[in-house]
Amino acid sequence: MEQLLHYVWKHKLFPLSPLSTTDHKLVEVIDPGLHNRNAGPDFFNAKIKIAGTLWVGNVEIHDKASDWYLHAHDKDERYDNVILHVCGNIDTEARNSKGALLTQMQVDIPENVFKHYQELLTIDQYPPCYQIIPSLTKLTVHSWMSALQTERLSQKTEAIEERVRRCNGDWENAYFVTLARNYGFGINGDAFEQWALNLPLRAVDHHRDDLFQVEAIFMGQAGLLELNTIPERYQKDALNDGYFARLRNEYLYLSHKFSLQPMDYKLWRFLRLRPQNFPHIRISQLANLYYNRRAGLSQLLEATTVKEAKKVLSTSVTEYWETHYTFGSTSIRNEKHLSPFSLNLLIINTVVPILFAYGRHRGEEKYCDRAFDFLEELKAENNHIVRMWQQCGLEVENAGDSQALIQLKKEYCDKKECLRCRIGYEYLKR
């Protein structure tokens, strides 16, 4: 219950009766302080009147006073300026590293707060706070959604910055890796990222004017040009149609030239995948995009509208894949363009985060602003998370809202972090 005590202290949800220390001195909390989630006391720079005297310093909170010793705070000088030790149960006195006795105060969690908190933890429905959604003010919802949207973009920025580091500071390469990851559309995201990191783009650039060679390197590095990667029933047809063999021979030549090593094809997942999401199709689309010089960050930065961004990312498969989903398996002819749905997802999960991250990196707000503009312009994603919130009465107007709700579920609801959620706050204070 220590987390709940933190919450009660932070929001000053104390009982109406006067507060007092264990030695019966009256306490008035002027400012509970700044919540610290890192090492050190729980709240910094609190302002508290004790027996009429104003104290400014840090506050430490525990379930039991004896936890002070359990956590070895009595041996840690960082806790020497604690002006008040707040506990749910005072079961012992406490001293700091200098041997000075701490001022202690017992705080009881209000019954209604405890009851509502237990409801949030135990209700078998998502979201557990569904009862109060219709009563939330527009200001409360809008401010929280905006904060969640920024939080999600910041989280994605960290992932992009890590890719930039792995790409030795090359933003163009890091953008391609990010784009490739999102071509996995969830299920094959990790495999696509590994594939892109294993792709020597500088070597590919030497053959960029030859689409066949680009596709040979792309498919070969994905580990998809080995005969045993093709289902046995299609192997004979794959060898007879000639395209597989020509690609494989071209890759063998180029892999020897550039000392290439393919990834393990077993990393690719096919189970429950729609055929248009098969790695072969997505890799062919990426090869076409790369060949047409529309897979680079510089081209993307020139796109100032969603329409222009979609034009940059629009692509289709090479001719062979118009009638195939895997090597040797024929299908009805289909140019297999990226669907409007897929384009929207790529803009939400690739274009927007890369603009935001690059804008921060360069200190150019225009790219950050463009990222938010794109989210506002795009329609909200239609997934089970968004639909559940809509069923509770929440209005979801655009992709910014749907991204905020995904962040809310993954980082708050799933982790039971209701005490850090503004909707949870409204629920608890009822």
Tell me what each language-model feature is.
Residues Q149-A404, E417:
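Hydrophobic, aromatic-lined core segments that form the binding pocket/scaffold
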